[in-house]
């Protein structure tokens, strides 16, 4: 029973608690579909997602690793002859900059239901 509780506790830990620095990498693109590839970050880097905007155009996005001191900054980037204002949003944890998926939501729901089944029923 104790082993079961320990396993559930480990599964319930947020992804950022494992200390692994793997992130999704995606070149600057005007497509919101950024499947990307996996990359390993340095010890002083965090995962990031960059969102760029320019007047009269659609947004651009990129993902990867970034020095933690550069997180949250806004910088100009050029894409297809247009200069965008790119703002980076950083996160910590393994692959934290990937797009949320229905599998993540389903896993959280399954974990909650599993915990509920392990608890003894209350007597009224």
Curated annotation (Swiss-Prot):
GO terms for biological process: binding of sperm to zona pellucida; cell adhesion; fertilization; sperm-egg recognition. InterPro entries: LY6_UPA_recep-like, Snake_toxin-like_sf, SPACA4/Bouncer. The keyword Membrane applies. It is found in: Cell membrane; Cytoplasmic vesicle, Secretory vesicle, Acrosome; Cytoplasmic vesicle, Secretory vesicle, Acrosome inner membrane; Cytoplasmic vesicle, Secretory vesicle, Acrosome outer membrane. Coiled coil: none annotated. Disulfide bonds join 23-47, 26-34, 41-65, 71-90, 91-96. Residues 1-19 form the signal peptide. GO terms for cellular component: extracellular region; inner acrosomal membrane; membrane; outer acrosomal membrane; plasma membrane; side of membrane. The keyword Kinase does not apply. Testis specific. Expressed in spermatozoa. Residues 23-97 form the UPAR/Ly6 domain. It holds the Pfam family UPAR_LY6. Residues 98-124 form a propeptide. Keywords: Cell adhesion, Cell membrane, Cytoplasmic vesicle, Disulfide bond, Glycoprotein, GPI-anchor, Lipoprotein, Membrane, Signal. It is a lipid-anchor; GPI-anchor. A lipid is attached at residue 97 (GPI-anchor amidated asparagine). Belongs to the SPACA4/bouncer family. Sperm surface membrane protein that is essential for effective sperm-zona pellucida binding and penetration during fertilization. This is Sperm acrosome membrane-associated protein 4. The lineage of its organism: Eukaryota, Metazoa, Chordata, Craniata, Vertebrata. The gene is SPACA4.
């Amino acid at each position: 029973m104790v082993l079961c509780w320990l396993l559930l506790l480990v599964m319930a830990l947020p992804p950022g608690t494992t200390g692994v620095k793997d992130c999704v990498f995606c070149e600057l693109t005007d497509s919101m579909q950024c499947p990307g590839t996996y990359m390993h970050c340095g010890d002083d880097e965090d995962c990031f997602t960059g969102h760029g905007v320019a007047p009269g155009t659609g947004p651009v996005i990129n993902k990867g690793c970034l020095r933690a001191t550069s997180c949250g900054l806004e910088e100009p980037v050029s894409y297809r002859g247009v200069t965008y204002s790119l703002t980076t949003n950083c996160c910590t944890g393994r692959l934290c900059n990937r797009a949320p998926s229905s599998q993540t939501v389903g896993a959280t729901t399954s974990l909650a239901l599993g915990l509920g089944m392990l608890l003894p029923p209350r007597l009224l």
